[in-house]
A protein has these predicted regions:
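Catalytic-core "active-site belt" of small-molecule-metabolizing enzymes
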Residues: 1-170, 178-203
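Switch II (G3) loop of P-loop NTPases
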Residues: 175
Length: 203
């Protein structure tokens, strides 16, 4: 599926796992917390480039590929808008994000720098229940879909109140607990259980 892939809008969901909300000292939301990354943030390569003077943290997430135009009317129709599932990293400049939050400002600059939307472009048609991230062969994050506060359908329906979807839109659906900083030379492996992983190197 990766050969002819053209991404459009990139939507992201914050605090969709209670454990992650708690580890950052945030309240658990009562509706999906949506933010965006720019299209230029997409990184489907095998390398992650991080600035040497910044603390960039990984956030492992299931990524949805939207395959239909328009807006669904109900949960069943919402599911039909998903044409593929993959795994990705929402890279975050945590120090900048914290400063922006203190000032009551949007997170945009801390979330949408070049290469901050890392995606395995090999989308699959069924989503496994469990997913994971290792850094230097040590488990950093493990997630299970049953622990999501808002389901894929919840997220799509919530977004459709504001936007009409385009074919090629991407949704990062939230990260489980265990986020942490990346350093140059780190060897990363991310994937779904019992599926071929995506391997990356931090440079």
């Amino acid at each position: 599926m990766s050969e002819n892939l053209k991404f459009e809008n990139i939507y992201c969901v914050g605090r969709n796992f209670a454990g992650h909300a708690k580890e950052l000292g945030n309240k658990i939301p009562t509706s999906p917390l949506i933010f965006q990354k720019s299209n230029s943030a997409v990184n489907i390569n095998e390398t992650i480039e991080i600035p040497s003077n910044k603390t960039i943290e990984h956030e492992l997430e299931v990524v949805l590929l939207i395959g239909k135009e328009g807006a669904p009317k109900n949960r069943e129709e919402a599911h039909t808008f998903i044409s593929g599932f993959s795994i990705g990293l929402d890279l975050t400049d945590r120090h900048l994000q914290t400063e922006l939050k203190k000032k009551g400002m949007p997170w945009f600059a801390s979330k949408t720098f070049k290469g901050s939307a890392v995606i395995d472009a090999n989308f699959i048609h069924e989503c496994p229940q469990e997913f994971y991230l290792t850094v230097n062969q040590k488990i950093r994050q493990e997630g299970n879909l049953k622990d999501m506060i808002f389901s894929f359908e919840d997220i799509i329906l919530h977004l459709s109140k504001t936007v009409d979807f385009k074919k090629g839109d991407i949704i990062f659906t939230g990260t489980p607990e265990g986020v942490g900083a990346l350093e140059s030379g780190d060897q990363i492996e991310m994937g779904f259980n019992n599926c071929p992983p995506k391997k990356l190197v931090v440079i």
